[in-house]
């Protein structure tokens, strides 16, 4: 019934039968967009019970996005009127709960991966020992990122005593979906002369330079790595060691960008 109504699947029984066949004969990781009041709660548990019974390898929970700040950047929001997405922290708790309740691997996007500690596993206190492998920060810069990523990135740079780096989180929740509208909301008095924006931000370089220099201060705008961690969509077959190693590589690339664009003379 849910597939017929929400996915417009003309033959939902056949789709579920195919899912069962794949579960029983291959390593299948399913994915579901969790819409509050539609397929969460008891419905979600029923889905998980069925997947576990069929022998699924894993399940990726995907938080429903319904606003511009949640990632709908094409002016087509809301997708569903009258439905509010779960708060990010509450969604992360849901992922943790489902992972504990079932025998298959459960991850979530944008949060979290209970098995690896991601995203930003190196921000966790128990992983602080790995921060010694991040290069020394010699430059001075402002990092612009998403609302979700900002606290994690700030914590990491605080722990490595990078006093000349500050982190600004825009209201957009996903860093690679940052647009020029997000940059226009930034208080430029908090922005240093060198700025690092996400590598995959949806902002033209000329727009970024114009917007971030609108107060008369000509700023250098560089791009950091495409990613700084491994999202739950990609980490479901990773170990905690894999994630930490990847994050260290990406943060060293970020430090390289800071030291280059924010070189102090």
Question: Where is each model-derived feature located?
Answer:
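Conserved AdoMet/S-adenosylmethionine-binding subsite of the radical SAM
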Residues: 1-71
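Auxiliary Fe-S-binding modules of radical SAM enzymes
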Residues: 45-265
